[in-house]
Amino acid sequence: MIRVLVVDDSLVMRKAISRIFEQADDTTVVDTATNGEAGVEKARRLEPDVVTMDVEMPKMNGIEAVRHIMEASPRPILMLSSLTEKGAEVTMEAMRAGAADFLSKGASSATLRANDVEEKLLGKVRALADSNARLFREDGPSPAETVSSTGSREASSSSSPTSSGTDTATKGSYELAVIGVSTGGPMALQHVIPALPAAFPLPIAIVQHMPAQFTRSLADRLDSLSELAVAEAEDGMLLEPGRVVVAAGDRHLTVERREGALTTCTPAEPAGDSHRPSVNVLFRSAVEACREDVLTLVMTGMGKDGLEGARRIQDDGGTVYVQDEDTSVVYGMPRAVAEAGLADATFPLDDLPDAMQKAAGAPARP
């Protein structure tokens, strides 16, 4: 049974959120808290498997509560926030403080009662209950340090076939790098993109499962940390070395070749994919535009988005790397690709930038 602590200053929201967990077969609410201060104390005392956290609360807001919880008793925290631009900025700050993921709770309890919101809430909590909470904090230990400091994870770096990654780097010359990532992605991407040099010779296209306001905030954050130019994707952007584009949260990101040049497209269709933006949609378009000259990363995230796209990339002779289990916040998307036999190599998070540079023939960052 997954034990959940619900922190929200609204009585109506606390009841609505609690009802969802109590009606599910595998979740239960151990307690509720009306503000961040009480949430910190109850998280320490009750040791829940997952905490759901409001953003704006009296006495102590959600961001401060996240910092205190991650310092005193680290555990997965799911932020429940609004879909406003301000809400996106505050939520991203909470994730930098250590929150694992977020979900829009809308403006009323009626929004929560919508079936898709209930399913998303339960799905995220179930995934986070099995996640590695120590990886969430931006100022916390690096994934490599986390692996080496936990008994059952000590063999991660040596057991991951990093050497096979360098072997597959000669599979072909590359024209484009594509990345698919979900839960835990914002922090994972901050380990990868800023570690690449300005001379990295491939454009990079990223799908991170997030609403629109959040993807812009993520792109701005990565741009501020990186030597590469990072921006939220718009239709018609030229994909050239030194540029990184992040799919907008309400649009797909695809790649087309126009007059010989790789260019972004941001269609709303196909609507049938379970995610928008969809990793599969990006990967399929990359194969169609570049054939075998695609370097692919599948990183931390729940679900299987990217599996079929990775299969297409492999079938056409491209290269697929996956993040390993020990450094993934949620080992869902990488697991699906690895277990299908589609991964050329598996790397700990901190080794991914070096693997990308070796594959692309980029000079090491000084």
From Swiss-Prot:
PROSITE patterns in alphabetical order: CHEB, RESPONSE_REGULATORY
The entry's keywords: Chemotaxis, Cytoplasm, Hydrolase, Phosphoprotein
Entry-linked InterPro entries: CheB-like (IPR008248), CheB_C (IPR035909), CheY-like_superfamily (IPR011006), Sig_transdc_resp-reg_Me-estase (IPR000673), Sig_transdc_resp-reg_receiver (IPR001789)
Reactions performed catalytically: [protein]-L-glutamate 5-O-methyl ester + H2O = L-glutamyl-[protein] + methanol + H(+); L-glutaminyl-[protein] + H2O = L-glutamyl-[protein] + NH4(+)
Active site: 182, 209, 305
GO biological process, one term: chemotaxis
SUPFAM superfamilies: CheY-like (SSF52172), Methylesterase CheB, C-terminal domain (SSF52738)
Coarse class of the protein's main subcellular location: cytoplasm
Chain ranges of the CheB-type methylesterase domain: 170-363
Compositionally biased tracts (Low complexity): 146-169
UniProt-listed Enzyme Commission number(s): 3.1.1.61, 3.5.1.44
Top EC class, one word: hydrolase
Transmembrane segments: none
UniProt-annotated stretches for the region Disordered: 134-169
Subcellular location: Cytoplasm
GO molecular function annotation: phosphorelay response regulator activity; protein-glutamate methylesterase activity; protein-glutamine glutaminase activity
Record note on modification: Phosphorylated by CheA. Phosphorylation of the N-terminal regulatory domain activates the methylesterase activity.
UniProt note: domains: Contains a C-terminal catalytic domain, and an N-terminal region which modulates catalytic activity.
Database matches in HAMAP family: CheB_chemtxs
Family, similarity comment: Belongs to the CheB family.
Function text: Involved in chemotaxis. Part of a chemotaxis signal transduction system that modulates chemotaxis in response to various stimuli. Catalyzes the demethylation of specific methylglutamate residues introduced into the chemoreceptors (methyl-accepting chemotaxis proteins or MCP) by CheR. Also mediates the irreversible deamidation of specific glutamine residues to glutamic acid.
Protein name per its UniProtKB record: Protein-glutamate methylesterase/protein-glutamine glutaminase
Protein source organism: Salinibacter ruber (strain DSM 13855 / M31)
